[in-house]
């Protein structure tokens, strides 16, 4: 078993396992060691993993002949369940913070355990837009690929936000991401995962090369712009705004691809 342990740690299995436990509700063998120190480098891999699960469900429901809108609602429901609402909680808290006109009080409002009216509305908007965007695709192969692009590049936006902007709280779940990130190697790894994963799945699903190239560039631009916009509103980022970057990037990427 010694060879297995060497291989496991050499290829970052302990870090991947920790990323699965932190970012998803998927199981991981409790006897396998995990290390949470640098899990942010695997966040785009988590996006690809989740998108493949959703893609399988989407394809299965399509094969069964389920109505498009109902099918999309089921897929989005599993999407929410697989993440445990981790990022959606950030959408709510960030919306409540943005509703405060005094910027100096926004962080305090976001720490309140109660969700305000703006937070509830933001959650509803995100879920509705995802559902209707998925239902609007006339090409089912493109809809499947859109899931991969949205989940992967949305999380790349979070990785970029961690790398580029200051973290506004000394403690919290997001602090360890900023503290432990090794900028160049981790950002490069996360970018390579989603670029090769997105392009590879695009070819596998028979997506036109011009669309693969254009959507890859556009998705990266959207994810960067969303992270930058939230950083401008708060003068940096928190764990909540990281979640908001993921969710709103996913929404905008889905909406953009639905127009093709």
UniProtKB/Swiss-Prot annotation:
Coiled coil: none annotated. Pathway: Cofactor biosynthesis; adenosylcobalamin biosynthesis; adenosylcobalamin from cob(II)yrinate a,c-diamide: step 7/7. GO terms for biological process: cobalamin biosynthetic process. It holds the Pfam family CobS. It catalyses: alpha-ribazole + adenosylcob(III)inamide-GDP = adenosylcob(III)alamin + GMP + H(+); alpha-ribazole 5'-phosphate + adenosylcob(III)inamide-GDP = adenosylcob(III)alamin 5'-phosphate + GMP + H(+). GO terms for molecular function: adenosylcobinamide-GDP ribazoletransferase activity; cobalamin 5'-phosphate synthase activity. Its main location: membrane. The keyword Transferase applies. The keyword tRNA processing does not apply. GO terms for cellular component: plasma membrane. It is a multi-pass membrane protein. Joins adenosylcobinamide-GDP and alpha-ribazole to generate adenosylcobalamin (Ado-cobalamin). Also synthesizes adenosylcobalamin 5'-phosphate from adenosylcobinamide-GDP and alpha-ribazole 5'-phosphate. This is Adenosylcobinamide-GDP ribazoletransferase. It comes from Synechocystis sp. (strain ATCC 27184 / PCC 6803 / Kazusa). The lineage of its organism: Bacteria, Bacillati, Cyanobacteriota, Cyanophyceae, Synechococcales.
């Amino acid at each position: 078993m010694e060879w297995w342990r060497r291989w496991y740690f050499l290829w970052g299995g302990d870090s991947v396992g920790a990323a699965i436990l932190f970012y998803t509700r998927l199981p991981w063998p409790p006897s396998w060691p995990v290390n949470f120190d640098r899990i942010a480098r695997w966040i785009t891999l988590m996006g690809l993993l989740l998108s493949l699960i959703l893609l399988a469900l989407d394809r299965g429901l399509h094969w069964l002949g389920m109505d498009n809108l109902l099918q999309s609602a089921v897929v989005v429901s599993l999407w929410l369940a697989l993440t445990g609402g981790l990022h959606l909680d950030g959408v709510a808290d960030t919306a409540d913070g943005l509703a405060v006109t005094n910027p100096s009080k926004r962080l305090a409002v976001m720490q309140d355990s109660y969700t305000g009216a703006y937070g509830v509305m933001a959650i509803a908007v995100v879920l509705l837009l995802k559902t209707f965007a998925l239902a609007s695709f006339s090409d089912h192969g493109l809809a499947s690929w859109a899931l991969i692009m949205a989940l992967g590049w949305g999380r790349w936006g979070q990785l970029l936000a961690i790398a580029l902007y200051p973290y506004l709280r000394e403690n919290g779940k997001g602090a360890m991401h900023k503290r432990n990130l090794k900028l160049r190697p981790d950002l490069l790894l996360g970018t390579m995962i989603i670029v090769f994963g997105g392009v590879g799945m695009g070819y596998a699903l028979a997506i036109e090369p011009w669309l693969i190239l254009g959507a890859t560039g556009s998705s990266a631009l959207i994810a960067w712009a969303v992270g930058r916009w939230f950083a401008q509103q708060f003068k940096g980022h928190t764990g909540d705004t990281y979640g908001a970057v993921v969710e709103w990037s996913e929404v905008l990427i889905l909406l953009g691809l639905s127009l093709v």
